[in-house]
Structure formats: C-alpha cells, structure tokens
Amino acid sequence: MAAPPQPVTHLIFDMDGLLLDTERLYSVVFQEICNRYDKKYSWDVKSLVMGKKALEAAQIIIDVLQLPMSKEELVEESQTKLKEVFPTAALMPGAEKLIIHLRKHGIPFALATSSGSASFDMKTSRHKEFFSLFSHIVLGDDPEVQHGKPDPDIFLACAKRFSPPPAMEKCLVFEDAPNGVEAALAAGMQVVMVPDGNLSRDLTTKATLVLNSLQDFQPELFGLPSYE
C-alpha cells in the first residue's frame, strides 16, 4: 500500500501511453511482425518492455517469444513500420487540459521519455506547440541516462535540470508503465499511474495514486491549484 499523497512543487511526465497515444501503435506493429512466426505480442509481454529503450525492449521480446532474429533486426524492422504511423499519434484525454492548467499557474513541469531523438520528433510532429510548453525535455538517448527505466537515471537527470532543482520528494511523476513507476520510486519521487485498461492490476499496486485517465487527476491532492 503506497503512502498517502504529499504536497509537491514540480511535475515530470512520461510521454508514450501517458500524454501521447503511441502504445497502441507499438502493439499493432509488433503484432504484425510476430504474426510471421505465429506468436502473440500479448499484454504480458508488452508490460515487460513498456518504458524501456529500443534495443533492450527488442531483446526481451525475442527472448520471451523466441523469435528467430537479432535485436538489431527487430528494431530496424519495427522502426521502419513505426515511422509510418508515429505522426498519427494523438494526445491522450486530459493531457492538454492539465498541461495548460499547470502552465497558467506557473507550476514547473518537464518531460522524461525513453524515446530517442528521431523517434521523439516523429511522434510529436503534430504537437510541437504542446511540447514547447514543457520547461525541458530529457530523452532516452541523453548522455546522462546511462540506464533505462526501472533505473531512476532519467527522472534524476530531469529533476536536476529544473532551475533551481527541487528536492526529489517534491517531484511528482506521471507514468503509465510499471517500469516507469519503479524508476520514479527509486528516484525518491511520488508517482501517479495512469495504466492502460489491459494492464494487470497486480502491476499497479506500488504507485502513490492510480487513475483511469489523466482527466480524473485532482491537482489539489498534491497541494497544487485545483481546476477552476
């Protein structure tokens, strides 16, 4: 059972599946590849790789499903297919409302995503204005991010770049993936989890708060200004 919410001053957002509806696109593409080998890219497999860097995720998929290809081949083929669909990614319900609300009230917030720069540019091509509202953005290929989630590197790097940097316990992370929740907790931060409905509920127990949608977030629970 997670501790009750404590007041925070700074917010850090994951991107895939939380702010942008990209996880669905990953599922479609990986299932397409798995079909060739009569394998199923199930939610059990997906929950192992969500939030991980591309090569690491590919190796897990290959090991679990016993696909006869190298991780490099899987990344290359999936990236080619994903390039075609990434620009169609839509914002998740409630994302824009929350970000505009935080901006209006001068609450500092940043983005921490495992996506590398090329992938980030494709995914956000339709939403440049939205992502320009963030104080800074830390990507998965950032030199300070030695280890992907569930290690805390990306959230620690992101918190340090606020000016001035807050205490870690004053940061609230928003995540959709179990690996991301683990990473936030390892960084000493609280975490709001907005899991996909298909994710096993056993994988949501560690979060400070679990929501069905960003639309359900009540900022005042964490000492932030409430919606008007």
UniProtKB/Swiss-Prot annotation:
Highest taxon above the source species: Eukaryota
Top EC class for this record: hydrolase
Catalysed reaction equations from the record: psi-UMP + H2O = pseudouridine + phosphate
Required cofactor(s): Mg(2+)
Binding site for Mg(2+): 14, 16
GO terms for MF: metal ion binding; phosphatase activity; pseudouridine 5'-phosphatase activity
Induction trigger: Inhibited by low concentrations of calcium.
Active-site residues (renumbered): 14, 16
A Pfam match: HAD_2
Example of a GO biological process term: nucleotide metabolic process
EC number: 3.1.3.96
NCBIfam families (alphabetical): HAD-SF-IA-v3 (TIGR01509)
Function: Dephosphorylates pseudouridine 5'-phosphate, a potential intermediate in rRNA degradation. Pseudouridine is then excreted intact in urine.
UniProt name for this protein: Pseudouridine-5'-phosphatase
